[in-house]
A protein has these predicted regions:
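Core dinuclear metal-dependent hydrolase active-site scaffold
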Residues: 4-64, 158-159, 163-166
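Cap/insert and terminal regions of metallo-dependent hydrolase folds
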Residues: 53-154
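A generic short-segment signal for beta-strand/edge and adjacent turn/coil regions
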Residues: 1-2, 13, 31-38, 83-88, ...
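Short, acidic/turn-prone active-site loops that include or flank metal/cofactor-
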Residues: 2-8, 70-73
């Protein structure tokens, strides 16, 4: 058995605070990392079926959020996965859809988050272009402009994300 540490830890001057995610695994966690300055924060929020109010509250105030944008719902529903797996992925304990991610990104931009990396994309049920489009269209519809109000990148397994300065 592996014990899950729910306490804050410090490594090289960074404070790392785990938080619970909504996923069908034992003790799924995301992380808020506070920089050496004690102010600048980043979050990693993947393997979550939906963004709970608690999760949103926890990552509010982060300058950078690395967030799951796992699947396009239409691709998932018409794709090769059996219905039982589709149902699990679409559940509150599955994975975050592009649209649900876009909703979270919009809420976070409204609260001051400026940098996003869309992550944990399904190879079978998503494309980087669809993930990017869902978030940027939602942000545009609320009047946010890319490179003014936010910077958004898509992480893929094939390419490194590069260094992001916040």
């Amino acid at each position: 058995d592996i014990a899950v540490n729910t306490d804050d830890i410090s490594i090289a001057g960074l404070n790392i605070k785990p938080f619970k995610t909504s996923h069908d695994c034992a003790d799924g966690r995301g992380y808020v990392i506070t920089g050496c300055d004690g102010v600048t924060k980043a979050a990693i929020a993947t393997d979550t079926g939906y963004v709970t109010p608690e999760l949103l509250s926890t990552i509010t105030g982060c300058k950078l959020v690395y967030i799951e944008s796992n699947h396009d719902v239409d691709m998932l529903r018409t794709g090769p996965y059996p219905f039982t797996l589709q149902k699990r992925i679409l559940s509150n304990f599955g994975h975050l859809s592009n649209d649900a991610c876009a909703d979270a990104v919009c809420a976070l931009v409204n609260k001051g988050t400026t940098h996003f990396v869309l992550a944990h994309l399904s190879k079978e049920n998503n494309t980087p272009e669809l993930a990017y489009k869902a978030s940027t269209e939602a942000l545009c519809s609320m009047g946010a402009l890319e490179n003014r109000d936010y910077i958004l990148k898509v992480a893929t397994p094939e390419n490194e994300s590069g260094i992001i300065t916040v």
